[in-house]
Amino acid sequence: MNLQHHFLIAMPALQDPIFRRSVVYICEHNTNGAMGIIVNKPLENLKIEGILEKLKITPEPRDESIRLDKPVMLGGPLAEDRGFILHTPPSNFASSIRISDNTVMTTSRDVLETLGTDKQPSDVLVALGYASWEKGQLEQEILDNAWLTAPADLNILFKTPIADRWREAAKLIGVDILTMPGVAGHA
């Protein structure tokens, strides 16, 4: 089972404060473990424009049609001071990993310098921090009914309102997550 470019969808019974009702986009999954970014937990009072200001990045030339007031996500409980930018191609930045044909993760400053300009990738999600699972840990959590999985959908990742992403991700596999019981069994 390789869940790269998939969503993890928290089951209703998962009550961990960080992962409760979360949607995690899996960026890497292999025999050593998994790494992902939570895509539906906005950080309070932190927008992309705020990150650019803190880093003293001024978009030039500024394209006013590109909104920089989008929230920054809490990507996960690890390295919360590090930025992870999920975006559509191109992937010609200093530190980019192509996750799928249509999704790239970049951790270098050069992608931030394109935000708000005509060089910005068409779709962007900025997160601080990430989530990680050791070898076999994620698979066990799935067996323990902590997570549903679904192939990633770029519309949900980049365009669906943040508050709707949990429910919409579950709908990808025909589940109305809001009507699920708090505890699930095994069939």
From Swiss-Prot:
GO cellular component, one term: cytosol
Database matches in Gene3D superfamilies: VC0467-like (3.40.1740.10), VC0467-like domains (3.30.70.1300)
Family, as annotated: Belongs to the UPF0301 (AlgH) family.
Protein name: UPF0301 protein YqgE
Alphabetical list of NCBIfam families matching this protein: PRK00228.1-1 (NF001266)
UniProt xrefs under InterPro entries: AlgH-like (IPR003774)
